[in-house]
UniProtKB/Swiss-Prot annotation:
Keywords: Antiport, Cell inner membrane, Cell membrane, Ion transport, Membrane, Sodium, Sodium transport, Transmembrane, Transmembrane helix, Transport. GO terms for molecular function: antiporter activity; xenobiotic transmembrane transporter activity. It is a multi-pass membrane protein. This is Multidrug resistance protein MdtK. It is found in: Cell inner membrane. The chain crosses the membrane at residues 11-31, 53-73, 93-113, 127-147, 160-180, 191-211, 243-263, 276-296, 316-336, 357-377, 387-407, 418-438. The lineage of its organism: Bacteria, Pseudomonadati, Pseudomonadota, Gammaproteobacteria, Enterobacterales. It comes from Klebsiella pneumoniae subsp. pneumoniae (strain ATCC 700721 / MGH 78578). CDD domains: MATE_NorM_like. It holds the Pfam family MatE. Multidrug efflux pump that functions probably as a Na(+)/drug antiporter.
Amino acid sequence: MQKYFVEARQLLALAIPVILAQVAQTAMGFVDTVMAGGYSATDMAAVAIGTSIWLPAILFGHGLLLALTPVVAQLNGSGRRERIAPQVRQGFWLAGFVSVLIMVVLWNAGYIISSMHNIDPLLAEKAVGYLRALLWGAPGYLFFQVARNQCEGLAKTKPGMVMGFIGLLVNIPVNYIFIYGHFGMPELGGVGCGVATASVYWVMFASMLWWVRRARTMRDIRCAERFSGPDFAVLLRLVQLGLPIALALFFEVTLFAVVALLVSPLGIIDVAGHQIALNFSSLMFVLPLSLAAAVTIRVGFRLGQGSTIDAQVSARTGVGVGVCLAVFTAIFTVLMRKQIALLYNDNPEVVTLASHLMLLAAIYQISDSIQVIGSGILRGYKDTRSIFFITFTAYWVLGLPSGYLLALTDMIVPRMGPAGFWCGFIIGLTSAAIMMMLRMRFLQRQPSSIILQRAAR
């Protein structure tokens, strides 16, 4: 039992900085929304529209690069640190290629916004301007993620946290300068948020690069000392590992976007209540998501050491800690749901609906924690294809259709409105949790030689 407590302490030591880094990232989005809203409601709406298109695209690239963390962790655990720098260099090449693709897609997404039915021309113009300013930050963001994944693969999660808060501190004054046009800069309104955020991503990358080059613990890993061109064999392997993660993230983000679109015709009260419950649930999700990143590092490191038993201890401890956290957040949600809803809105109907939906959110928090930590475990085992198939099946084959039937039709029960979609979330996330755990057990029951062979690829 002692080994599980020791492992839990190590997991939390890795996870807490990741949690704080996620808080900083979320706060940056909050600052953009508030400061754009302070300029005008149209500019705030433009930032919201642009962000809704930016997030799926950039998270696709983010997911692709997550393959680097278990690769670095496994090489570190096996003592083959001399092979880390070449892998990271190829990570930068991959980030560069993906950045170009994302920038092209986002530039052309502007035409989609302009052609939206009944959209205000000024709103469309500002949203397109915001997106086309922000897209220049895509390379900086993805290069930062490569450096961050290198650090996290080496069990150094604090640098990502520090750079996240540096980005937040830089974002506020730079937003102010470009939104309102100070120090000789043009007054850009909401578009200035895009300029500021793009600039901040490059600052975060430069800061992280400076830290990596000066860190004593990484003096033997010098990615910038010699140039190497693209190694397509390594790039292909990273894509094979990362693409299922990227697609899983993309499908998860688009699922919630589709549900938001399906809820929107139900009326202002339903939309507001749904959005409040979803926003709070997203904040709670940061805890298991950060723990999942820590579990990936620990499982990858243990497999690199050649110990499948210790990898199992890391995996089981991660699930146990995740369930404990989820029980705590679920109880907190149930007890404080009305007070939480009042922080967002004081309309009695909105508060009542949001409080009701938060009860459903509390139910799925345990399943959500298990499935996201299960995903982190499978990443550590480099079994990423199953993550995609499980996520797609749970969300799009089970969760969304069942939510649609419950929310908008009378086929099963009288139409439930937004609560039906939340029941669909429960079905989808619970299915994902069960399938993740079954897959984990299947992997762990394989002979050690097969597990270690897969991890060493």
